[in-house]
């Protein structure tokens, strides 16, 4: 099983847009990421995103890029400051590949918890538009398969 951890694309500042929608660069970066995922023929069972508009936009762009159009789903527990343990428990029960679209510092803590079993140890330098693919071994351990940044 694989999970794809995505930090939303670059967004506008609150002073320009109270919803902090994706910027033009952020939209372009995520469209390129979607094209990359489509070329790799990645199959994802579910795409989950936080409540923030920029995460939903990122998820929608990626969903439209994948060959088998997936519906995106809001999922509680993916906000920037949410605890990671509940989502780790949920991920470990999954049998199908999923994508989570969220924010820092949550994504950094999540990958630390999954790979190093310590959410306080950072191992990936996420920037807006980063994706990290993790794969679960037969022993139930998570390993970084690949990472792509804009």
Residue ranges and their predicted role:
Residues 2-82, 107-108, 126-129:
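Active-site-proximal alpha-helix that buttresses catalytic centers in soluble enzyme cores
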Residues 3, 96-102:
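Generic beta-sheet signal
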Residues 21-23, 64-65, 90-91, 115-119:
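Glycine-rich, phosphate-binding/catalytic loops in enzymes
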Residues 104-113:
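Extended, charge-rich low-complexity interaction segments
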Residues 118-143:
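Domain-level recognition of soluble alpha/beta enzyme cores
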Residues 145-150:
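Short, solvent-exposed aromatic-acidic interface loops
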Residues 39, 64, 89-91, 122-124, ...:
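Short secondary-structure boundary/capping segments
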């Amino acid at each position: 099983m694989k999970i794809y951890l995505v930090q939303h694309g670059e967004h506008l500042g609150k002073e320009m847009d109270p919803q902090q929608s994706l910027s033009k660069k952020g939209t372009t970066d995520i469209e390129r990421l979607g094209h990359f995922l489509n070329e790799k023929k990645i199959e994802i069972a579910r795409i989950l995103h936080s409540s923030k508009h920029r995460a939903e936009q990122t998820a929608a762009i990626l969903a439209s890029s994948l060959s088998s159009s997936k519906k995106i789903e809001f999922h509680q527990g993916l906000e920037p400051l949410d605890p990671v343990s509940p989502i780790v428990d949920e991920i470990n029960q999954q049998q199908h590949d999923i994508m989570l679209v969220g924010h820092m510092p949550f994504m950094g803590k999540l990958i630390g918890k999954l790979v190093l079993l310590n959410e306080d140890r950072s191992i990936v330098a996420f920037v807006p538009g980063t994706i990290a693919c993790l794969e679960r071994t037969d022993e139930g351990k998570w390993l970084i398969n690949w990472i792509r940044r804009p």
